[in-house]
Design a protein with these regions (language model features):
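Cytochrome P450 heme-binding "Cys pocket" and the immediately downstream C-terminal segment
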Residues: 313-316, 442-479, 483
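Cytochrome P450 heme-thiolate "Cys pocket" and heme-binding signature region
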Residues: 143, 416-449, 472-475, 480
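C-terminal helix/juxtamembrane-tail motif
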Residues: 2-5, 479-508
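Conserved cytochrome P450 K-helix E-x-x-R motif and the immediately C-terminal K′/meander segment
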Residues: 55-76, 243, 247, 326, ...
Length: 508
């Protein structure tokens, strides 16, 4: 027995010693690497702030855009801002944004930072459900936004827009912001719900959607149920819209008559386990689609008018009008999906508006695991697990290293051969997000705005009466502040109009 023990010890001890040496060497190497990296992979610098409340006093005094701009100018492309009980690390620019947009949901999550939307969209959808269910619901929307469906929606949009503007006289003055809020609600509801609800939806839905947007304020991100007037109006509006949409869903199911619109697509959708969508889910999905689409298109449509009709941008307005003359000369009064795809100048005009006036102030994520980012200057920062991270679109899309003269409205920057957004690399243009969570409604939004402005440019001479609008920074999805008054005079862009060179393109 003693001999066996000695033999066992003689066999095991060398292995144990060798293993210990190897593990010690590996740990020492890891410590050396960590020590070598520690001077670079340090925590992001923190913006100056008051005790306990952080940057809140500066936020109230300067507004969110200026606070973020100041911190970016002082601290660079990676910095942290303290706001009450929360620390937010901002990642500015394509060099440090890859993980934000491409990271796995297990590493970079939307859930923890987006639950403030639940009072707006309601139960059973979006961030009230688990990731697997939300992915399937996004798939339902994606199926409803495929090119074949967009071709159908284009015809519906054109008819609604043409009918709406018959209400305008030969000349007059209107609040463009209010007009487009109503029109976009009408157009979106036609594509979403069908013709039978069109008149019922118009003014009441537009009012309630405005109350929903007004109820999604900056304070909502931190305190979504704070008993303030804006939240009370939001809750009442959500309840009323829920009633309207529930009636629509019930009526459609009872009719049993298939209709070619988004509601029918969502009713016909099935989860992977074969389950159909419930009425509660349908109401929430319809509301979220209408809310997002109505705000993005009406706000962007208004900004498009404000930019194109500004005196400094007369050249871009002329280019957009000339393009409509070419299209009319080629196709007459026909406007459909294919014709809209040829409106490249108008598309660039809208894209540039979205660069300067994105639908959201910033995008948020929650870091479930720590990660390291490297700036274009070569500095490394480690973002810790548990941190809220933000991509500030208002700064991100105006970087001088990506866009030449970034504060200037210049649609030509997106022309072929110039393509500043492409030259800047991935995630240089993020008006509709990007990566794993790019907006599925981007093509729908562009098409809707193009239909509206194609009609306006063809049929009206326009002049902006109001000063260039300020931005309403009080809400999460900022838009033009106040009235945007426009004077118009009807004109006829005849298909027989003489075009000097029908193949002339906007000079980039």
């Amino acid at each position: 027995m003693e001999l066996a023990t000695v033999n066992w010890v003689a066999y095991v001890v060398p292995i144990a010693v060798t293993t210990t040496i190897i593990i010690s060497a590996m740990m020492a190497r890891r410590r050396r690497r960590r020590a070598e990296r520690s001077p670079c992979a340090r925590p992001p610098p923190v913006a100056a702030g008051a005790p306990l409340v952080g940057v809140l006093p500066w936020l109230l005094a300067k507004g969110p855009l200026q606070v973020i701009r100041d911190a970016h100018a002082e601290l660079g492309s990676v910095f942290t801002v303290r706001l009450l009980h929360r620390e937010v690390t901002f990642l500015v620019g394509p060099d440090v944004s890859s993980h934000f947009y491409q990271g796995l949901d297990s590493e970079v999550s939307q859930d923890e930072v987006s639950r403030f939307t639940i009072p707006t969209f309601g139960p059973g959808v979006a961030f009230d459900v688990d990731l697997a269910t939300r992915r399937e619901q996004i798939r339902f929307f994606g199926d409803a936004m495929k090119p074949a469906k967009l071709r159908t929606y284009a015809g519906l949009m054109v008819r609604e827009v043409e009918e709406y503007f018959t209400r305008w006289g030969e000349s007059g003055m209107v609040d463009l912001k209010q007009e487009l809020e109503l029109l976009v609600t009408l157009v979106a509801s036609r594509c979403l719900f069908g013709e039978e609800v069109r008149s019922k939806m118009l003014r009441e839905a537009a009012t309630h959607l405005r109350e929903l947007n007004d109820g999604m304020r900056l304070v909502t991100i931190l305190f979504p149920h704070l008993p303030i007037p804006a939240h009370r109006r939001r809750d009442r509006a959500r309840a009323r819209l829920g009633e309207i949409f529930s009636d629509m869903v019930r009526s459609r199911r009872e009719a049993g008559r298939p209709v070619d619109d988004m509601l029918q697509c969502l009713i016909d959708s099935r989860y992977k386990d074969g389950r159909a969508t419930t009425d509660t889910e349908l109401v929430g999905m319809l509301l979220s689609a209408l809310f997002a689409g109505q705000h993005t298109s009406s706000s962007t449509g208004t900004w498009t008018g404000a930019r194109l009709l500004a005196r400094a941008n007369a050249e871009h307005l002329r280019a957009a009008v000339r393009e409509q003359e070419r299209v009319v000369g080629r196709y007459g009064d026909r406007v459909d999906y294919e014709v809209l795809q040829e409106m490249e100048t108008l598309h660039r005009c809208i894209k540039e508006v979205l660069r300067l006036h994105p639908p959201a102030m910033m995008l948020l994520r929650h870091a479930r695991r720590s990660f390291t980012v490297r700036t274009r200057e070569g500095d490394e920062y480690e973002v810790p697990a548990g941190r809220t991270i933000a991509s500030p679109l208002l700064i991100h899309n105006r970087l001088p290293q990506v866009y030449r003269d970034p504060e200037r409205y210049e649609p030509g920057r997106f022309c072929p051969g110039r393509g500043e957004d492409g030259a800047g690399g991935a995630f240089s243009y993020t008006a509709f997000g990007g990566g794993r969570h790019a907006c599925v409604g981007e093509a729908f939004a562009y098409m809707q705005i193009k239909v509206i402005w194609s009609h306006l440019l063809r049929n009206f001479e326009m002049e902006m009466v109001s000063p260039f609008p300020e931005t309403d920074w009080n809400v999460v999805m900022p838009g033009p502040k106040g009235k945007v008054m426009l004077r118009y005079k009807r004109r006829n862009m005849s298909p027989t109009v003489k075009i000097t060179n029908p193949h002339t393109r906007y000079v980039c």
